[in-house]
C-alpha cells in the first residue's frame, strides 16, 4: 500500500516516537494505538515499511519474549494466583487449561520461527518469576 498523503511525519520522526514510547514502558500494541489516535499515523508498516517490532529490534530495544506470549503468560499467572485462593473454581480451572494450551501452541510456533530458543518450554513456576 502507498503512504497516506495526510501523514506529515517522516520515517525518522516516527522511529524516534516509537523508541521514546518504548523507553516509557509502552508495549508495541500500545505504541501503535498512540500513534494512530494521537498522531494520525494509521499503520506504521504502511508509512515506514517496517513493523514496530522490526524497528525496535534494529535499535536493540525489542523485548526478550513476544508480546502476545507474554500477555497469555500474565493471564495464566493471574488465574493460578486466583486458584490458589479459590481451589473449587472449576470455570477458572478450565480457563487456565485453555490459556496454557494456547501458550504451548504459540511457544511451539515461536520456537520454529526462531523467536524463542530451541527447547523452550512453558513452566508455570518460571512464568510467575518472568512476569513479576
Curated annotation (Swiss-Prot):
InterPro entries, sorted: Ribosomal_uS15, Ribosomal_uS15_arc_euk, Ribosomal_uS15_N, uS15_NS1_RNA-bd_sf
Keyword check for Ribosomal protein: yes
Q: Which GO terms describe its molecular function?
A: small ribosomal subunit rRNA binding; structural constituent of ribosome
Which terms under GO biological process does the entry name? translation
Q: Name one GO cellular component term.
A: cytosolic small ribosomal subunit
Q: How does it assemble?
A: Part of the 30S ribosomal subunit.
The family note in this entry says: Belongs to the universal ribosomal protein uS15 family.
Q: Which PANTHER family match?
A: RIBOSOMAL PROTEIN S15P/S13E, SMALL RIBOSOMAL SUBUNIT PROTEIN US15
What's the protein name?
Small ribosomal subunit protein uS15
* UniProt organism field: Methanobrevibacter smithii (strain ATCC 35061 / DSM 861 / OCM 144 / PS)
- Identify the gene encoding this protein: rps15
Amino acid at each position: 500500500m502507498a503512504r497516506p498523503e495526510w501523514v506529515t511525519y517522516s520515517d525518522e520522526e516516527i522511529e524516534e516516537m516509537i523508541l521514546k514510547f518504548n523507553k516509557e514502558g509502552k508495549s508495541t500494541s500500545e505504541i501503535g494505538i498512540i500513534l494512530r489516535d494521537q498522531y494520525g499515523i494509521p499503520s506504521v508498516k504502511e508509512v515506514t515499511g517496517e513493523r514496530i517490532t522490526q524497528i525496535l529490534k534494529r535499535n536493540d530495544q525489542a523485548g526478550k519474549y513476544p508480546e502476545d506470549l507474554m500477555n497469555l503468560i500474565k493471564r495464566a499467572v493471574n488465574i493460578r494466583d486466583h486458584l490458589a485462593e479459590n481451589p473449587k473454581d472449576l470455570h477458572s480451572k478450565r480457563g487456565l487449561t485453555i490459556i496454557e494450551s494456547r501458550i504451548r501452541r504459540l511457544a511451539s510456533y515461536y520456537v520454529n520461527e526462531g523467536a524463542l530458543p530451541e527447547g523452550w518450554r512453558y513452566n508455570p513456576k518460571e512464568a510467575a518469576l518472568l512476569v513479576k
